[in-house]
Amino acid sequence: MKNKLAPRAVILVLLAASITGASPQPPPHRVGDWQSFGRDPGAQRFSSLRQITKHNVAGLQQVWAFDTGSRDLQATPLVIDGLMYVTGGSTVFALEPETGRQVWKFDAGSAVSKRGVAYWPGDSTKVPARLYTGVSSGRMVALDAATGAVVTDFGERGYIDLKQSVRGDVDGPFMLDSPPVVYRNIVITGGSNGEGSPSTGLYGDIRGWDARSGKLLWSFHTVPRAGEPGVETWDGDSWKNRSGTNAWSYMTVDVERGLVFAPTGSPTSDFYGGDRKGKNLYGNCLIALDATTGKLRWFQQLVHHDIWDWDLPAAPTLIDVTRNGRKIPAVAQITKMSTLFIFDRETGEPLFGIEERPVPQSDVPGEATWPTQPFPVKPPPLSRTTFDPAQDFYTLTPEHAAYCRELWDTHKMYTKGIFTPAGLDATMVTFPSTLGGGNWSGLSYDPIGGRVFTNIMNLGQVARMERRSNPAPGAPEYERTSPWKRPIGRFWNLETRIPCSAPPFGELVAVDVNTASIAWRVPLGVFEDLKARGFDRTGTPNMGGTITTAEGLVFVGGTIDKRFRAFDAETGAQLWETTLEASAHATPMTFLDRNGRQLVVIAAGGGGLLRSEPGTKIVAFALSPTKRSS
């Protein structure tokens, strides 16, 4: 066993040495801590801990659970200097990591960032460590990391009004659904500013703030203003007061190069662009900014003129690609379309090529779909992107097959593959859906094995366009609907949530980043009634990400079957699973407590867009002392 593990151990030591030498930020307080949503600023979600191995992971047991009192939990807990931080509902909690005992809590009175908090370690002026999170009133609050008290000398009595420094309709919605990121003494925010109707609202500017005072330091206009580069990609004045085009998901920091990478969403309205003809920069872009000044370094637009709600939903992941013996600093971006793009971190050049391919065009009056869309040459899409009604229906039972066939025939459904636009006279089916493919759960990266891991869905969506009889001011003339009179319909049985397409419905996928080839893929999740009939490799829809460890383990929840699992990073073999009280639509984390015990923690909140049974708990797992010593 020692000989088998030795190569990973040697590589791990070299990685740690190179990272420590390159980083101008303060070093981690404890090696076993998890200091940001992605553990490190580059969102690799990789842990160097080695106590839990392939040989003993089956012995993991629940050691504590903390009830947040809130449902639909999506946050990844942080553990820093002996405290765990997590959000739920309107509350930020600090817990004792060893036991789950509450140390303090801060109740904002309205919803806080549902995906957690950002941590700043303080600075040389003796300003103590702080936490930053959003509040649903459109504000960001700073808390003392030790006590949970509002830091009153930050902003206005501890708060920044994020609406006031953004031009546009200040009455529009604004929220930090995902936590900000921190570079040195700068807190960098994106935000959720409305994606539906009307099309106008607050701009989705990316901004940098002084971590001590809350002073605005810089802004990057995700919708260019008059005279700025990119404004020519908007027809006429359609850029004015345009909402959406925002970094609502996680951002990533390259500390060594002083870069922040931001994935942006689609411009409003999500499903009709007749009032915003053009490519619509910087919508649906991966943007690299100077983290100190906010100046644009480079960008790549991955969807032109989006009318599918195919935001870039996930944190860009910093990786290294080895080519001809040379290590290239790279950044990987998963999309809702399940395409995986890999770029040179410094220049933005695609490392495995990009092709502009013709795509179907819309026949909705006034719409002007872009004639081509970008596809990576490698790897291929990670999820289903086509559907053939002659052979791809799931014929599990006569009843299910009849339900899906009737749905198809009654609503005159059709598909032309990925990027099929919704029409007026029939209902389109396209794969993936607005849930992905990939989503905010994103990637984890194993720098030892040179692979990224992601959980994807093979779930289609159905929709058609409908002309509004009396559109509200600022609303587009056409809106998207479905057989269920919702803007988005899933291509599944509404009662059972079993998709109409053949399985697998959800998968865990590993990609070799040095060759951009799929290393392995396995079904992820089970439907209980199908499992009882012997169909236990169907996978399920899922939402919630992966982490990986130096011992070659991949941990993932996400599925609607309430399971939490561990897989072999090399082969994709499942090594462990447990059943939670609710599905875990969140990304796990792992840390080493003060007693030298490695724990794995996940939020099991259910609910969400997959309509899972709700839960309210943060759950921790560890090995027994006898298993740890084995």
What are the functions of these language-model segments?
Residues 315-364:
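Phosphate/diphosphate-binding loops
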Residues 23-50, 370-383, 388-399, 473, ...:
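N-terminal pre-domain segments of enzymes
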Residues 43-126, 133-156, 160-163, 549:
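N-terminal cofactor/phosphate-binding cores enriched in small/glycine residues
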Residues 63, 101-104, 151-152, 217-218, ...:
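A structural motif specific to WD40 beta-propellers
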Residues 31-38, 70-89, 112-139, 172-198, ...:
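Repeat-blade elements of multi-bladed beta-propeller folds
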Residues 65-76, 105-126, 156-181, 221-250, ...:
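Extracytoplasmic beta-rich repeat domains
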